[in-house]
Amino acid sequence: MYVVQCMSGKEADVQNEIFSQGYMARVPAAVRIERCGGKWLDRLRVLMPGYVFVDSPMHDDLYHSVKGVDGVIRWLNPGRPESLCEDEITFIRRLTANNEPVPPVDIETKPHLKIHSGPLAGLEHTIVEFRRRQHRIRMRVTVLGEEHTVFLSANFRETPSERH
């Protein structure tokens, strides 16, 4: 799996164009719970704006056809694109399973941090911060050795000791 940098907001267009050329492309997205006008709304948000993940073996045709797509800025590690490591590939595939956005995760914070559902179950070690009031968690993601921060929506579960 390789990474293409594209213009922010053009991720879906770039993904569709890469699909139309016969290659697999992934854009991690999530349903984010946001407050707007006093109401909580579900909105679709790209998790890593400006990046499209190309899930195909690298060869000259792929390199040149993707580079020519409108909205593509460059391959990461230009000249000789570098593949993601296996852990990074697994994580991106979990985020983009069935080309569906990541739903809000069910999470319990006491006595220990625990993700109960969704593609992120078992990845508690990547959570950096949780914000109950905003219904959000912040996760650490590594892509080609660089750390990125991703925000996901969360439904916080109460434990029996928290109820009064």
Positions of predicted regions on the chain:
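Acidic-enriched and Gly/Ser
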Residues: M1-K114, T126-I127, R131-Q134, R138-H164
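Short, charged beta-turn/beta-strand-edge "cap" motif at the junction between a beta-strand
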Residues: S117-A121
